[in-house]
Amino acid sequence: MSPAFDVSPAFDVNKAGEPEAVCPERLGLPNLGDGVGLRSVHFRHLMHTPPRDWGVDWFEIISENFIDNRGYAAHVLETVAAHRPVVMHGVSLSIGSSAPLDRDYLRKLRDLAARVQPAWVSDHLCWTGINGVNTHDLLPMPLTPESLIHVADRVRAVQDFLGRALVLENPSTYLQFQASSIPEWEFLGMLAEATSCGLLLDVNNVHVSATNHGFDAPTYIDSLPADHIVQVHLAGFTDHGTHLIDTHDHPVAAAVWPLYLRAQRRTGGVATLLEWDARIPPFADLLHELTKARLARAGVMPAVARVPRGTADSVSTPLQFQLGFAHEPV
């Protein structure tokens, strides 16, 4: 029998306006409830709204937007972290690269974690550059036994350096290596078992990659080790005709909600994060989208959202749309 879900938040709110957990932990990490990304376009709203009225259980930051940032964005983050749990989500770890780990970046990441005290630190199963060149994209890697050993060694090194478990997200991909011999879901599962890292299951990325490469999305979700999944990402994508691209600029598509329900039922319920990084709407619209997530957990599929269409010549989404928002004028 599938676990029962209701449409209430995963957290209660105490008299001070801070959420109190009512859901169990996994890998020693709590179910944070329903959250959104902390973006500069919403700084003014958050700073002028009492925390008890924010309407979300937690926030996720793009780590690179706050590394070396001691300005107004840091002040907002400090205020938010005093009232809600925060998760650090990075895009520059490049865990799959053959280049040495960037120790300077890791030191800055560790320093930021010391300031923020995040619930966890996450990044992506990908590589972003080599030999000092940053592609500003989350690139797929060959999924082979050799690369599994390579990435596992790097994950252990990062975890030792940071002094905490690392959480890795499945990327959206638009090409594959002919040398790959391990399905991505098996690769992630073996990596999690070998390193005790957590998994961030992006169900939008699963749908995007499944459509692009022709694999079965439910099989992907069902094959991951549920006890390692600590978080789920929701986002919108763009249909480019021959392929889909993960663009984070529209509401969650209808095809993604059943995958979200499947993931939540399989895990017994884990933290949900709505990503929206371009064409960012008012904060109230994000709360409305989170309400859809609560309904979906109850088995009530939200109304169909329009899927935007793009041109066939786009093959990926650069990272610039995620970076820099913390530094925009407010």
Specify the residue positions occupied by each region the protein language model found.
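Conserved, mostly hydrophobic/aromatic
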Residues: 59, 121, 202, 232, ...
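Acidic (Asp/Glu)-rich catalytic clusters
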Residues: 47-54, 71-88, 104-119, 158-161, ...
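Active-site acidic/histidine proton-transfer and metal-coordination neighborhood
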Residues: 102-199
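Distinct, well-ordered alpha-helical segments
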Residues: 43-50, 177-193, 209-223, 284-287
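Gly/Pro-rich active-site loop or hairpin
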Residues: 70, 100, 138-148, 209-267
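N-terminal pre-domain/capping segments
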Residues: 3-4, 14-111
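C-terminal helical cap(s) of enzyme catalytic domains, especially alpha/beta-barrels
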Residues: 283-303
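Acidic-and-aromatic substrate-binding clefts and catalytic sites of carbohydrate-active enzymes
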Residues: 43-44, 63-73, 94-104, 174-179, ...
